[in-house]
A protein has these predicted regions:
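Asp-based, Mg2+/Mn2+-dependent phosphohydrolase catalytic module
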Residues: 1-4, 32, 78, 101, ...
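N-terminal helical cap/lid subdomain that shapes the substrate entry/recognition surface
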Residues: 1-98
Length: 219
């Protein structure tokens, strides 16, 4: 094995409660009595659906379309283009998991470490800068114009980096996007199971945090 590809959010960087807090702020601004958790659950489903459509849209564009649709469904009056900024701002200043910097440093001495994330580029780079993280190769869905689990996402990265599927390990916390989809392409996978659920999706390895990769990979 020559390289390790990392998902970011939920894997290297915590999303915390930023998204649900943003929803609460949006609904409070509208003086709405809609249950924030239910509203957010619908938002996530719309977001995922748009990520899977044929026409590529950036996450920023998807967030706007999502909120416009939700405002229409719930009869909420207001400027969704203005209100969505609350959600977009929640994407910044997210915090790295504590074990990550040292683990990445150890892994990078033996393997090429590559970022492969379902996100727009600018917020991701801001989060890396905020946490003092530096990576040589960073791939985003915006740059690739494809979202996981589209095979194009993984295959373009492999092609540009000059690796075969057998030469890399993909590490992430999503069963479909980080385990099932890359596994179908012949890529080894590591599930980051921070909640220690013990779920099996056909992953090569299961870890509870990134530091556990080091002994597995001989670092």
């Amino acid at each position: 094995m020559k390289a390790v590809l990392f998902d970011v959010y939920g894997t290297l960087i915590s999303t915390g409660t930023g998204s649900i807090n943003a929803v609460k702020s949006i609904l409070a601004k509208k003086h709405s009595e809609i249950e924030p958790e239910a509203f957010y659950a619908e938002w996530k489903q719309l977001h995922k659906k748009r990520m899977r459509q044929t026409l590529f849209l950036t996450e920023r564009e998807i967030f706007m379309k999502d909120l416009a649709e939700l405002y229409s469904v719930y009869g909420i009056a207001g400027d969704y283009k203005e209100d969505v900024k609350i959600m977009l701002e929640s994407l910044y200043n997210r915090t790295v998991y504590p074990e990550v910097p040292e683990a990445i440093n150890r892994l990078s001495k033996k393997y090429e470490v590559i970022i492969a994330s379902n996100t727009d580029t600018e917020p991701l780079l801001q989060n890396f800068d905020y946490n003092g993280l530096v990576f040589g190769k960073i791939y985003t869905s915006e740059g690739l114009m494809a979202y996981k689990p589209n095979p194009k996402f993984y295959l373009t990265i492999l092609n540009e980096c000059g690796y075969s599927p057998e030469e890399v390990l993909y590490v992430g916390d999503s069963c479909e996007e980080d385990i099932i989809a890359p596994s179908q392409l012949g890529i080894k996978t590591a599930l980051v199971d921070r909640k220690k659920s013990g779920n099996e999706y056909g992953q090569t390895f299961s870890i509870n945090d990134i530091s556990q990769l080091c002994p597995i990979l001989g670092c």
